[in-house]
Amino acid sequence: MDTTGIPTSFYEHDALSLAPMLLGKYMNMGGVSLIIRETEAYMPNDSACHAYKGKTNRNAPMFAKGGILYVYLCYGIHQMLNIVTGPQGEPQAVLIRAAELISGASIVQKRRGSLDLIGPGKVGQALALNKTFSGEKLGVRLSICDAPEVSYTAHPRIGIGYAQKKDREALWRFVMTPTSL
């Protein structure tokens, strides 16, 4: 595992380009290390994007320059981890949908009661995320470290029934293939 952080210029890519590039990368925080296995892209012109209708207090981090976190509460219980991408003023982000545990099993077991990290709420719980992370630069508490490129498949996103049909059907969910590591 490469233990160096990724340069901030990496996060200047748009979310659709960056989402598959994050697959296979390592996330580290507080004794827990994970491999990113599934992501979803959210772009400014995307009706599923939280910033689609404009800036609010909740989605304000999405309007920052790429390389910060956007963490929000979903269904009143799940903390969802997003990596903000692109230039300042163009709101876009990549949702981390699933991960694989590399180290810190006892910590994750205590937090979750399970080591299953398939689902964005489970990833947030494993990392003990809360709203104080939203707007924070990567590398302060949560770091993402480089890893070789992996193969992946593209699929429609999940849980966006409210979005326009074209956005619901877009192949903007990326899943690392099992043989990639």
Model-derived segments and spans:
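Conserved, well-structured core segments that form or line functional sites
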Residues: 1-181
